[in-house]
């Protein structure tokens, strides 16, 4: 015997021949009793009985384990519950066994008061589970027995056992004695069960059993039926017995026999039903509605299973009159029409939340889209033309179902649900195209095999997504598309989808970012998404730019994935446009797979919205000036390529290629660019490292800052993607695998020098020097080549040119004459840079900072030897060039270094503007060579500096070696000894 404790319960297991015989589970005990005494009492009662003989004799296979639960009852009574494993019974057989009696049985009776009862559901007499009474020395103890399924912990097993409940015993001794007697009775019953069953089969069974027998299970208690009214005013369900009627019609009408039974104020809105003898009802009755918000009765097609043949049409209550509806007109005919000939009712399945929608259902669109519609005066009458997609009215949710009292824009844009899976974006595009064609997108049948087939077709046009896949090798791109169970990222493959389905795609996203890494592990591809903190920061900045104070909705219009240091080209030239929505849903409906889900957005007036959406999208695209300074490299074995084409011709070539493949472009027919004589249909293309097209066949696009989108053509230099794809902004030096043409290299080095040496720039203070511009034109012929090739005009170039001069500054007009180019002067102290705005200057500084941080020591040494590069600032480390004419230059990187360094009159000290505490004030260091002292002068304007300069220059007492840097951005002044 072992005693074990489990939580708050104790139980005893007694074994014989390694087989458990008895198991007691004691829950509660009588007052003042000792646990050990009770256990011993139970043990003595049970082991002294004849149960062991029964187990080894008559029916040893019927009884294995017995569980007893003892509990306190009211009025000093004790109850118990235990199970008899492997023994089941039939209630009718057990009652027969007890009523006929047996000499070996204890005094057991049946309390017949609750056995026989009349039940309205069955409308016949049945036998219920009886209450048994045990007569023990004149004491009547009630108990019940029932068949149950065994439980293993919290799991319900398929094994059946008998549950015995003793209800009102007087003591523990009574429970022990009665439980022993009941077990003995059950063993005798099991030996007699087959004989009783044969008796029932011979005497009580014919075609239908006279006694309802439920073997080895509890009886199911049925609910009583609804009381049938006997008055003339009836609930319609009492006359039309259709299950789940209220699920299709939530406003059930009333049905009366006579018009006199209809309330006087409602007699004007009644219909007759049934008109064609449905359900065996020959005389039509009157239907009316008693709802103030739905007073009009009307007919609807019965879509409920089980009664649609008997009642093809059912009445319901509506908010508006239904007299002219197709269903009512068809039902009122002399002959009842077929249901298939009547337009089906529009089922209003609409979700007013941001959860993931079930397939073929509609829901509320993101709040930012609703605000966008309101902001473009969508509700203006001029925007409600009839030339838009009016066929949407056949399936679009009604305004009463969608619109709330606060924001009516919810009616004019809704969200459509698709199947959950890795290819949800393909299904969203297909259903959007179905909607643009004037058909219900929910009627489109889409399976996984169809989606996988459509995904594999994208491999033929994968090159159009080169901008979004710039950091992925070419062969890996095809592997991603071939793996149909890998999530298809809309941020990465949107251009391929646009070309494949000939449609422009705008992306709205909520707390979702692109896939930043594809991890290849044998045949599986793992995904790593952009950090959510970075996504939330970007979307918060986007909302601030849009003056959106709503924090409840984080969805924004986003650009596809691309290199942030370069421009992104997306012209949206297709005639059709759709909007998709990428999100994770709410916490209750988050996609269990871990990747985002894609749905589509529909508009009541689609054309009007996408036209305005294109204007917003264009403003989000980075400007082309970043292409010059964005470190966009491409292979160029020969810098001097004579065969070039302009960007306009290259775009026309792209359009002609699209038209030749059957694409419908929105620009064709609106201008003559598509019919340019110089355009041709290209067969090959050359891309730079960031995925932009720089060459078609043998023709190089001449402009440095204007590229075009990649085309669905083979790539000549596709191997370039295998070399160092992670270091896209690294400066490769002079021995790099990817060569940069001379002019791009020159502009890069000039930018690098200017931004790292002087800090930030405020372009409004810069002036253009005519002589310095002329010298730049003549320098190695680079700028001359730029002008001669037609990349930029002279006027445009001079507008973007900024020159740092020596003693004087002059401003020239853009219309500079050619003879000014021929003036050559010594420009050893000149620096220059191309900028168009202060924002561009900030981008240049950022790119140059990234460039320097990624450079190696060897690359820095090469840059020092370059004729185009002067001192560079690296990690706030002071260094000077020994191989240039400016070997007396020292760079000061902080105000502390400036004030604490021991000044030497042989050096010129430069202070980066970022350390100046007040942008309106600048510092000038004046070195007094004779007295070996320095002086700091505050300069607030150019005029103020001029007066200071003249004062020191005309003074005989003080000679100065140099005056360095007016950091307000006017110019650099210098006076040599």
Curated annotation (Swiss-Prot):
Species of origin: Trichoplusia ni ascovirus 2c
Name of the protein in question: Structural protein ORF43
Localization (cell): Virion
Membership in a protein family: Belongs to the ascovirus HvAV ORF146 family.
Keywords: Virion
Disulfide cysteine pairs (residue numbers): none
Primary localisation category: virion
Domain of life: Viruses
Annotated region described as Disordered, given as residue ranges: 531-556
